[in-house]
Amino acid sequence: MIPGEIITLPEDQEIILNAGRPTLDIMVSNKGDRPIQVGSHYHFLEVNEDLEFYEIDSESKNFIFIDRSNLHNKTRGMRLNIPAGTAVRFEPGDIKKVQLVPLAGTREIYGFNGKINGQLDSSVEQ
């Protein structure tokens, strides 16, 4: 190996991110008047409050509002399922479908908007 060398798969092979991990598809709407950008590993429950989340009903295809004041909603412990170091930008009025994947590792959340600040699976919200 040469220092700084990047070794990739052959061109005919795809790199599959988060293979075999559970995912959640939701719709996200920017109700604010400014663009909002969310990074790859940002705890999605704690993103800017101007973003509204909706589940997609599998039968009717209708949107079902996800209450963000409930800290145990489906986005808890989830992040965007995109390559590390990248982000998704939501322009004012945008409605986008995004895929979320559970945070891995120790599943401890500190900082962000201060809603968890501890172990995800047993934290006391502040």
UniProtKB/Swiss-Prot annotation:
Q: Which GO terms describe its molecular function?
A: urease activity
Going by the entry's taxonomy, the superkingdom of the source organism is recorded as: Bacteria
Query: Would you name any one GO CC term?
Result: urease complex
Name the pathway it acts in: Nitrogen metabolism; urea degradation; CO(2) and NH(3) from urea (urease route): step 1/1
Q: Which GO terms describe its biological process?
A: urea catabolic process
SUPFAM superfamilies attached to this UniProt entry: Urease, beta-subunit (SSF51278)
The catalytic activity, as recorded, is: urea + 2 H2O + H(+) = hydrogencarbonate + 2 NH4(+)
What keywords are assigned to this protein? Answer: Cytoplasm, Hydrolase
Q: Give the enzyme's main class according to its UniProt record, as a single word.
A: hydrolase
Q: Where in the cell is it found?
A: Cytoplasm
Q: What EC number(s) has UniProt assigned to this enzyme?
A: 3.5.1.5
InterPro entries for this protein: Urease_beta-like, Urease_betasu_sf, Urease_subunit
Family (UniProt) = Belongs to the urease beta subunit family.
PANTHER family from the UniProt entry:
UREASE
Subunit relationships: Heterotrimer of UreA (gamma), UreB (beta) and UreC (alpha) subunits. Three heterotrimers associate to form the active enzyme.
Which protein are we looking at? Answer: Urease subunit beta
Source organism of this protein record: Gloeothece citriformis (strain PCC 7424)
Q: Corresponding gene?
A: ureB
